[in-house]
């Protein structure tokens, strides 16, 4: 299904779950919305932390239109689910942020690793959360991000189990896509990056890990949500983890090789 058709169904409330596997071949995006007076600090944070926060588009202040990524989209309605954070506390989860929108809001679209999953599949590497019909597993880590202005915190990662013999290939395939997190930041022992139990993700759902597989971890665009909990601004709006915007950007247009 074309991205604009998926967005229309989301806008109508007919799609309200995770978007992994939808509109294969098109990039998906995370969302961060905050007030204009914090926008420069956040843009600087993204520039200093490009693995977890690769910027695909930034809206004009007050505009809900991502003019580069999807010119006919509306970031207030075209994600299946949103999270509202007030002073660092998650207060609401909604399907439409139009009632919350303010004239000085700036929206950031952050590249999402769902965008390189089709490339993994094309290379014979199954994506477990798609096969199991669940959300991707995401975890807080002990990896510090580079601070910028008010923004500081630890990186969040997504995890996909990969057969050990294909782990290097998974790294090669995804390294072609730096605009959507690129290659993995860690392979193997989760404890080395501060993850205690793969069966208890901080965001998303747990997936099965089979004999002969290793966990492979990629930087994740949910990182700004963890950072928002530290910064505690008056209001930050994000997507709900796994519930992305389908953009009009072709995955392959983001590849470097």
UniProtKB/Swiss-Prot annotation:
Gene3D superfamilies assigned: PSTPO5379-like (3.40.1640.10), PSTPO5379-like domain (3.30.2040.10)
GO MF annotations, alphabetized: lyase activity
Protein EC: 4.2.1.-
Keywords from the UniProt entry: Lyase
Pfam families hit by this protein: D-Glu_cyclase
Family the UniProt entry places it in: Belongs to the D-glutamate cyclase family.
Protein name: Putative hydro-lyase YcsI
Species, as recorded: Bacillus subtilis (strain 168)
Classification lineage: Bacteria, Bacillati, Bacillota, Bacilli, Bacillales
